[in-house]
Amino acid sequence: MAIRKKSTKSPPVLSHEFILQNHADIVSCVAMVFLLGLMFEITAKASIIFVTLQYNVTLPATEEQATESTSLYYYGIKDLATVFFYMLVAIIIHAIIQEYVLDKINRRMHFSKTKHSKFNESGQLSAFYLFSCIWGTFILISENYISDPTILWRAYPHNLMTFQMKFFYIAQLAYWFHAFPELYFQKTKKEDIPRQLVYIGLYLFHIAGAYLLNLNHLGLVLLVLHYFVEFLFHISRLFYFSDEKYQKGFSLWAVLFVLGRLLTLILSVLTVGFGLARAENQKLDFSAGNFNVLAVRIAVLASICITQAFMMWKFINFQLRRWREHSTFQAPVVKKKPTVTKGRSSRKGTENGVNGTVTSNGADSPRNRKEKSS
């Protein structure tokens, strides 16, 4: 494996190139400041806001729930500090995966610049989607979402969350916020930035919406479903870069993508359109976190439906482009045998090809001309 030679001239401190080359180390130092702040009593109160989850409530043990009391969490303005800290952690993890995994594979495969950037994007996203799917599935199983689907809308508002649930949403927001500085760190092309901003903005809009409107149960199920389909796409693209004949993963992804959009719409309509619409408490109450009113329900369903329609439109365009490229690349060349007839006209037609196309017999070889002259 070739070792990259480090340039003798180091860029000036705090210059553009210096920040790009050492951004992971700089961010690590900033994160370390918050962790060191926990060690001193004067700064511990401020540092703990960034590092640990805030707004916990301890519920006493009941007769149904034996033995121990439980700690639940709700959201507040201090969550922004926690999201900021874990955004720094996401930048560090991103750099570790890039340097110790993706860069090593890139040096072995010798990708072009276009494939290099797409491979890095799929490598980072496939790792994140896989981790989020496993984590989200664990929460779904531990909190009995699979055995009792009515928990999606029953006992709304779901303003109290378990530690795993709140930490999951904090991590999701932190990851997608970290994608903004990564556009600068990864030297994203100007023409690709608008597409990336729309992509990141849609994730933040829906995750933050589910978190703030106390629809965290529905949001978790939809995220796990969506992330699984996206993971399959990006892992298939990684295999495609190593072997361009690989198409099985894309075929499976195409089927699951459509099914995922249908399941998303069904679960959303079932939860918001029927479950919450039949709930007894339908009054807007900010203090209790109750947003179960007609206007909010319509806005939630409209945003989900518009997003799914936008994704289907992008999917159809993507599939049409792939099929068009595949058909032009593998278009069969039909060869017709020239009809041998007497006279000069048939010989002239053979030289010019059949039906305007040049064939393998389009011109006599020197050997044939010699035989004819003899």
From Swiss-Prot:
List compositional bias (Basic residues) regions by residue number.
Answer: 334-347
User: InterPro entries per the record?
Assistant: TLC-dom, Translocation_assoc_membrane
Q: Which residues are glycosylated?
A: N56
**Keywords, ordered alphabetically:** Endoplasmic reticulum, Glycoprotein, Membrane, Phosphoprotein, Protein transport, Translocation, Transmembrane, Transmembrane helix, Transport
Repeat in keyword set: no
Q: Can you name a GO cellular component term?
A: endoplasmic reticulum membrane
Q: Which cysteines are joined by disulfide bonds?
A: none
Q: Which SMART domains match?
A: TLC
The answer on whether this UniProt entry bears the keyword Protein transport reads yes
Q: Where is this region: Disordered?
A: 334-374
Q: Residue ranges of the TLC domain? A: 117-326
Lumenal-facing ranges: 51-76, 143-159, 214-217, 273-297
How this chain sits in the membrane, per its record, is: Multi-pass membrane protein
Where does the record place the modification Phosphoserine?
A: S365
- Do you know which Pfam families this protein is assigned to? TRAM_LAG1_CLN8
Q: How does it get modified post-translation?
A: N-glycosylated.
> Any idea where this protein resides?
Endoplasmic reticulum membrane
Q: How does it assemble?
A: Interacts with SEC61B. May interact with Derlin-1/DERL1.
* Physiological role: Involved in the translocation of nascent protein chains into or through the endoplasmic reticulum (ER) membrane by facilitating the proper chain positioning at the SEC61 channel. Regulates the exposure of nascent secretory protein chain to the cytosol during translocation into the ER. May affect the phospholipid bilayer in the vicinity of the lateral gate of the SEC61 channel, thereby facilitating ER protein transport. Intimately associates with transmembrane (TM) domain of nascent membrane proteins during the entire integration process into the ER membrane.
Recorded family membership: Belongs to the TRAM family.
User: What is the name listed in the Swiss-Prot or TrEMBL entry for this protein?
Assistant: Translocating chain-associated membrane protein 1
Q: Please give the organism.
A: Canis lupus familiaris
Highest lineage ranks of the organism? Eukaryota, Metazoa, Chordata, Craniata, Vertebrata
What would be the name of the gene that encodes this protein?
A: TRAM1
